[in-house]
């Protein structure tokens, strides 16, 4: 009787009661989560913003805003060389962290890529290209793809590069004679897209011939944007979850699917056509695969296609960005420009003398390139890895299994812990022996890894260096460079000076207007 009266007094639960109960439950769960992340998590002792320690939202927001390199640089400047950037994630700028995270490890398995990472190439039919493959699959594919990237292969590809460099110089000469300012960023993009198409499957994009980009080239640049947005979504929603799929549809533009379709379908068609023409004597990547029985046996047709999709995207805009960044630094530093120009013109009596084996021997030109790669890395964003099941030590810090770790490349090269006067463009810091500058003797050069390092380091590093040296040496041999003295030209220089640009895995470079004059001899 008493119980019945009590129930009647209390009444039946209402929507308000249920709402209060749900709210209370959420608050309790959130409080427990915060307490666990702040006081009981294995990473609790590492410094970082309070919000980052309890949620992935700040890290995801940095990606969505296309500002991760800048955001992480600010965090490291405030909190030090090791920062907790997410509840279970650390970012490092220590030199030794490069090898500890990305290097060839002996006592532990190599770190796997984080499932958060997604590049320009998605899996297909359960297969992946080398970029997203697990360690075992990565080793198999890398071994099968290694032959086209050796120095011997580069020498065979030298004539391919020369054709496109000659086209670039011819186009620039016409601009110079007409006294037209040149947007070098665009022309470098035309050049690198044509080169990588010819190198991959003997089919240049035709950008240099038309003096403009095409739909395929534009799609590749946009794919980097979609991949970065997807990484941000994965941070808060997980990988492959219903929430992940829903947020992808909401956040990523519908045309992103078209970007991937254009890139994939074109790459697939070109790859299959090249595979069907094994007798063609052209030293492209697929020709090397066709000529190697081991490579043909190790790679499925789908894997070959996926890797060509990757090489086209990874070997085009990133290289153009480096060329444009180098040109900006040359324009900003006339003393360095004059010294590099004098070195190139003294070394070569004719442009035909500019070759792989000769251009790599120019110490000052190469020093300017290394310094440009330091200050304007083609890959400035963190590349997350996961600590293996046995745990690992990174930069002297014992870390448990499952911890996500990475190096912040842009923060590392701008840290005074690694480089003296880090914001200064100083090619002298890369000179050895007689040309070395004692001010930079203590620089930790290993902090600059523009092509990453270890088993997943960039396969195209040698090709990129060759392409960069060849194009830049030809530019200095043929032309005198000056910044364009116009309102648009000055605004572009301001944006470069402040690194006022978005980052979607690589930099979205601003225009760079240059006045060219033919060299007088």
Curated annotation (Swiss-Prot):
An example molecular function term from Gene Ontology annotations: monooxygenase activity
Membrane topology: Single-pass membrane protein
BP-aspect Gene Ontology terms: abscisic acid biosynthetic process
Location (main, coarse): membrane
Gene3D superfamilies xrefs: Cytochrome P450
Pathway the protein contributes to: Hormone biosynthesis
EC nos: 1.-.-.-
Domain of life: Eukaryota
Cellular component aspect of the GO annotation: membrane
Expression triggers: Expression is induced in spores.
Function: Cytochrome P450 monooxygenase involved in the biosynthesis of abscisic acid (ABA), a phytohormone that acts antagonistically toward salicylic acid (SA), jasmonic acid (JA) and ethylene (ETH) signaling, to impede plant defense responses. During pathogen-host interaction, ABA plays a dual role in disease severity by increasing plant susceptibility and accelerating pathogenesis in the fungus itself.
Name of the protein in its database record: Cytochrome P450 monooxygenase ABA2
Organism in which the protein naturally occurs: Pyricularia oryzae (strain 70-15 / ATCC MYA-4617 / FGSC 8958)
This protein's encoding gene: ABA2
């Amino acid at each position: 009787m008493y119980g019945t009266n009590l129930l009647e007094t209390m009444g039946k639960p209402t929507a308000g009661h249920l709402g209060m109960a749900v709210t209370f439950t959420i608050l309790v769960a959130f409080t427990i989560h915060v307490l666990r992340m702040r006081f009981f998590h294995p990473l609790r002792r590492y410094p970082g913003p309070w919000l980052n320690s309890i949620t992935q939202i700040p890290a995801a927001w940095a990606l969505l805003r296309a500002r991760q390199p800048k955001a992480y640089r600010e965090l490291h400047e405030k909190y030090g060389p090791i920062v907790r950037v997410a509840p279970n994630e650390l970012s490092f700028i220590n030199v030794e962290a490069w090898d500890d995270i990305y290097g060839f490890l002996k006592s532990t398995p190599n770190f796997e890529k984080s499932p958060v990472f997604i590049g320009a190439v998605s899996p297909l039919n359960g297969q992946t290209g080398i970029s997203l493959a697990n360690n075992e699959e990565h080793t198999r594919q890398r071994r099968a793809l290694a032959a086209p990237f050796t120095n011997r292969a580069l020498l065979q590809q030298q004539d391919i590069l020369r054709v496109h460099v000659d086209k670039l110089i011819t186009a620039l000469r016409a601009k110079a004679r007409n006294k037209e300012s040149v947007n070098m960023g665009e022309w470098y993009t035309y050049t690198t897209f044509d080169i990588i198409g010819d190198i991959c499957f003997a089919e240049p994009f035709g950008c240099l011939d038309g003096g403009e980009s095409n739909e395929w080239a534009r799609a590749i640049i946009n794919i980097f944007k979609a991949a970065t947005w997807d990484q941000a979504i994965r941070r808060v929603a997980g990988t492959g979850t219903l929430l992940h799929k829903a947020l992808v549809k909401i956040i990523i533009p519908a045309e992103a699917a078209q970007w991937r379709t254009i890139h994939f379908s074109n790459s697939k068609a070109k790859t299959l056509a090249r595979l069907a023409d094994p007798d063609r004597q052209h030293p492209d990547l697929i020709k090397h695969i066709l000529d190697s029985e081991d490579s043909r046996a190790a790679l499925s047709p789908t894997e070959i296609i996926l890797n060509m999709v990757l090489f086209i995207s990874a070997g085009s805009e990133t290289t153009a960005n480096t060329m444009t960044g180098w040109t900006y630094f040359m324009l900003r530093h006339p003393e360095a420009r004059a010294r590099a120009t004098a070195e190139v013109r003294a070394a070569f009596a004719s442009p035909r003398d500019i070759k792989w084996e000769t251009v790599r021997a120019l110490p000052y030109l190469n020093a300017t390139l290394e310094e440009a790669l330091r200050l304007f890395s083609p890959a400035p964003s963190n590349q997350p890895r996961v600590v293996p099941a046995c745990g690992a030590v990174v930069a002297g810090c014992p870390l448990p299994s499952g911890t996500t770790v990475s190096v912040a490349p842009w923060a590392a090269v701008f840290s005074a812990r690694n480089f003296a006067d880090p914001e200064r463009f100083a090619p002298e810091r890369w000179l050895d022996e007689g040309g070395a500058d004692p001010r930079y003797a203590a620089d930790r050069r290993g902090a600059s890894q523009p092509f990453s390092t270890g088993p997943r380091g960039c396969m195209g590093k040698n090709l990129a260096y060759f392409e960069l040296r060849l194009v830049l040496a030809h530019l200095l041999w043929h032309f005198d460079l000056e910044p364009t003295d116009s309102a648009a030209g000055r605004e572009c220089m301001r944006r470069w000076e402040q690194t006022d640009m978005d980052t979607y895995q690589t930099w979205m470079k601003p225009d760079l207007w240059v006045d060219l004059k033919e060299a007088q001899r």
